[in-house]
UniProtKB/Swiss-Prot annotation:
Assembly, per entry: Monomer.
Pfam entry (one): Trypsin
GO cellular component, one term: secretory granule
Protein name: Thrombin-like enzyme TLBm
Subcellular locations according to the entry: Secreted
Main location: secreted
Taxonomy of the source species: Eukaryota, Metazoa, Chordata, Craniata, Vertebrata
Organism in which the protein naturally occurs: Bothrops marajoensis (Marajo lancehead)
Record-level Gene Ontology MF annotations: serine-type endopeptidase activity; toxin activity
Amino acid sequence: VIGGDECNINESPFLAFLYSQLLSSRRYFCGMTLINQEWVLTAAHCNLYPDRKDMNWWLLIKLGKHSGSTRRWVANYDEQVRYWPKEKFIWWYCPNKKKDVINNYVWVWWDKDILLWELWMLIRLNRPVKYSEHIAPLSLPSSPPSAKWWHVGSVCRIMGWGQITETWWNSEDTLPDVPRCANINLFNYEVCRAYNQRWWRGLPAKTLCAGDLEGIIRGGWDTCVGDSGGPLICDGQYQGIAYWGSKPCAEPDEPAAYSKVFDHLDWSQSVIAGGTWWRGDDTCP
């Protein structure tokens, strides 16, 4: 998190992180949110080794941890580790009706304003976690976030163990010892399109747009590399999943994008309940 402060040790008992034993110094690479004893929610692009099940045993999900760096490793008494999931479900592409190419990336469209791509991933842990002082779920939202045209909407909280300097994936020295937290503001989707039409025209209208009001002009608080998959908490509710931002981070005129949790509640609840679920190779909802 760029421009943030150290999170209070009791602020984020729902925050987990994905850790790989094969990435050398880059061992931590994505945030996650615990939503009940068996399930965590993260960004779909955190699905490392998607076609190599034999590699999954090198991936760990750590919960209840506050000090996450190898330089200052201070364990909480109630930390828990889970190996790669029992199941994972990705909210994926729709069969394409139209393709558009932006900066050599193929965007697949379902209708005139909804772009469906890999946005988020539900992971079922290999065994349930036990709730404790530093491990507790973050409830799914009961209402959508608010944002007004050209005005500051909800005040939202971001957090994670991602980079604390603006450079794009630097050394481990730019990763914090403990998670960083910052307050940012939610903006109307059209406001973000006005600031950065190159990228925001390719993102679905249901995407949440958030950043620092002054930073929109001169750069400021922002998520960065390693914060992907972490939560966006607005008015105390879990409203977004970090999945896209500027490179370098915290650039002027480039607010970050978050997948909107509220708009996918039915899908998430269906998956957790063991019901039907949708992938890109099935009929679109």
